[in-house]
Amino acid sequence: MIEKAIVAKPKGLLKGVQSSSDSKGSPVKKSLEGKEAITYAKILRSRNKFVDALAIYELEKDSKNVEAHIGKGICLQTQNKGNLAFDCFSEAIRLDPHNACALTHCGILYKDEGRLVEAASYQKALQADPSYKPAAECLATVLNDLGTSLKGNTQEGIQKYYEAVKIDPHYAPACYNLGVVYSEMMQYDVALSCYERAATESPTYADAYCNTGIIYKNRGDLCLAVSPNFEIAKNNMGIALTDLGTKEKLEGDIDQGVAYYKKALYYNWHYSDAMYNLGVAYGEMLKFDMAIIFDELAFHFNPHCAEACNNLGVIYKDRDNLDKAVECYQKALSIKPNFSQSLNNLGVVFTVQGKMDAAASMIEKAIVANPTYAEAYNNLGVLYRDAGNIFLAIEAYEQCLKIDPDSRNAGQNRLLAMNYINEGADDRLYEAHRDWGGRFMRLYSQYTSWDNPKDPERPLVIGYGSPDHFLSYFIEAPLLYHDYENFKVVTYSAVVKADAKTNRFRERVLKKGGIWRDIYGIDEKKVASMIREDKVDILIELTGHTANNKLGMMACRPAPIQVTWIGYPNTTGLPTIDYRITDSLADPLDTKQKHVEELIQLPACFLCYTPSPEAGPVSPTPALSNGFITFGSFNNLAKITPKVLQVWARILCAVSNSRLIVKCKPFCCESVRQTFLSTLEQLGLESTRVDLLPLILLNHDHMQAYSLMDISLDTFPYAGTTTTCESLYMGVPCITMRGLVHAHNVGVSLLSTVGLGHLVAKNEDDYVRLAVQLASDVTALSNLRLTLRELMSKSPLCDGPKFIQDLELTYRSMWHRYCKGDIPSLSRMEILQKEELDVVQEQLHQQPNTSPQKLVKDEPADDASGPEHGPASKDNPLVLIKINGYNTSPSSITSPSSEENGVSQTRMLNCGDQCFRV
């Protein structure tokens, strides 16, 4: 257990949120009950999760809770259980006879039954609350329908239409119907005014324009018949075409959507909504220069369009122009101060910059502005993660998942965060991954057969998929040394912005006869189809649950054999992945850590490191000139747990005059620095002996920063990988510790492979002993530093050709098993399907055979656009969805740091709100 005394919350960061170690007051850990449960149920309803919301309402113990009865009724109503819904609304009315919401919903049920007279409940609702808009809208609809039903009685019908317009002056169908009646009565002037009013209230009301044209034609006014009010018609064409474009885009035809937007501008060249949506579409198509042009035009013609400013900020953020992004977000907020997306996005930028206090302030404001803003809680989790508070990070991710259980970002961030504190004492982390994988797999259809010839010795097609920057140090060897005659490489690169290294990799792959495909921004199901077309035999994903992963691609199971490797220290949890590549030190044969995948051990280390050409020379050990030992770590703050700090403090206290240097991005924030230092002071280490460095952007400068330390201290239970390799290559020996899980043992594998197994500790006391012992002989430390790079370069860790020979033998062994029908994932999926079938059959067997009397019909109402659909109470008002919203495809950017899991953000729905994957 981690001692509560040293779980320090950063000063100035998100006041009022408690550490998860104090579960008593935790908003996430506390069970849902009372008002909180009802609030959560309303959130679920707002996200159309009516079944889940109903389950919460069913648990409400207070039989006099009117809001619970109404909420339950609404959920039942959406499931076409009208009789049960009516009982709920009736009970609410019994408890509160003047409840406008309950009365309105009773009216809706009567109307859906065709009992328009009884639907006078709307009138009662208005009498109870004249300002209750849903009742007015629904009553207008009923009166309009009554007027139509009285077609044989013209005057009574007209009266009903006028009553509808009086109740809701903006109700266009009643105006239109008045026009029809007056046309039949040959009162064409009155009819024209009615049609014009209908068109004014609903500019896309085609029938109103058509009937207007007919009247003008019958009068002989052919010019007006062809173009009644030409300017209005052009504007309305622009509106209609823009809406049509958005409809096409949302249905998957983005090119047709763009064509409609452009056509809309032909009719109305200054229509800002069309420009705005063109900007959105071009952003989705990754044509960012065009997106910028149309977003700027949209803002020029509509200076109140905060959404356009926000979207510009998203693009500039993706292009690493953070100052310009901040300017755009601030401009959006000057227009809409409570614009939750821009508040959130500004918090994202500040988090990337390490300005944790400013980031916290913005994200908190976003949540205040929109309490159901799920991704803001996800970003809050990333903020806590970066600040080193994993417990609060996990709480924030879980809060996001409470609001949006399908949030992929929060779900995967939560799994990753749990690795930082998992010591392998139980199976909870495995179960969390397994459960996630089972749910995630159901979102995709799986391929279960392949055309790949089952010839055990034929040349194989090997597919690699990854977006990550740090992985380049470990993926270069396969791309360079594979035998392309027998192992043709296809690379699926999801890199956001190709740099010089990416271009070099591409050239090498293509020169050797391989295939390079850029898949950034392409739907994962389409990528899976590409993999099928490429006839990939073995597909290897390299990121697991880290940033911008393509596990959706793996969930489709496009290749006969699927493998996970390198980028994630645990199981993916996906039943569609056959194998996980590791070694006997990272995952011993007797490991108790469970995996969904079958473990395949390479004969040496499971990693092959290619040093950076920008590393520069090894510098002399600084203790020679300083006169004291400097310990250090460049791992991210999330890995430096309270227990790690306890051990480090013991080392520093045991080595007189020694110093500690730690480098990570959040140290540019004063509150994070002070929290870190105060924690060490509580452990007996003076803050004057600690140097904290913020992120160093340039790789050369980052590598040269190792010249400041004599001995590198590894983290646990999540050890370093890239940082350990960098440290060793720069001549800095590293102390690591053996553990029970893969994440803990990566350093064991790296050091043992290089020949430094004697620096692997068995436990915390041994860790302290080894560090103190190594620091006691500066001469030996200096000699080791001068020879360590050569020792590492000649070790199996950097022997690319030999590593690839072993890897190719492993691939061939997998293929032999496949040719014999041995497919681990298919066997696993068959077991899962059988288990699910058994559960369903058991549920059907236990389900009572009841058939309650129905009050309303099961069929949906004919007019799905009518205001009576989707009713809600005052606390849950009817929501009009703006169809011209921001709807971008996932895109991401990785922080240029040496940390293994770089920060990234994704543009999501709703005006480009950015969200972190870590």
Curated annotation (Swiss-Prot):
Residues 843-877 are annotated as: Disordered. Its main location: nucleus. Residues 843-853 have a biased composition (Polar residues). GO terms for biological process: gibberellic acid mediated signaling pathway; protein glycosylation. It catalyses: L-seryl-[protein] + UDP-N-acetyl-alpha-D-glucosamine = 3-O-(N-acetyl-beta-D-glucosaminyl)-L-seryl-[protein] + UDP + H(+); L-threonyl-[protein] + UDP-N-acetyl-alpha-D-glucosamine = 3-O-(N-acetyl-beta-D-glucosaminyl)-L-threonyl-[protein] + UDP + H(+). GO terms for molecular function: protein O-acetylglucosaminyltransferase activity. Induction: During vernalization. The keyword Nucleus applies. SMART domains: SEL1, TPR. It is an enzyme of class 2 (transferase). Pathway: Protein modification; protein glycosylation. TPR repeats lie at residues 34-66, 67-99, 101-132, 140-171, 172-205, 207-238, 239-271, 273-305, 306-339, 341-373, 374-407. Probable O-linked N-acetylglucosamine transferase (OGT) involved in various processes such as gibberellin (GA) signaling pathway. OGTs catalyze the addition of nucleotide-activated sugars directly onto the polypeptide through O-glycosidic linkage with the hydroxyl of serine or threonine. Probably acts by adding O-linked sugars to yet unknown proteins. May function as a negative regulator of GA signal transduction during vernalization, inhibiting adventitious shoot elongation during vernalization. Belongs to the glycosyltransferase 41 family. O-GlcNAc transferase subfamily. This is Probable UDP-N-acetylglucosamine--peptide N-acetylglucosaminyltransferase SPINDLY.
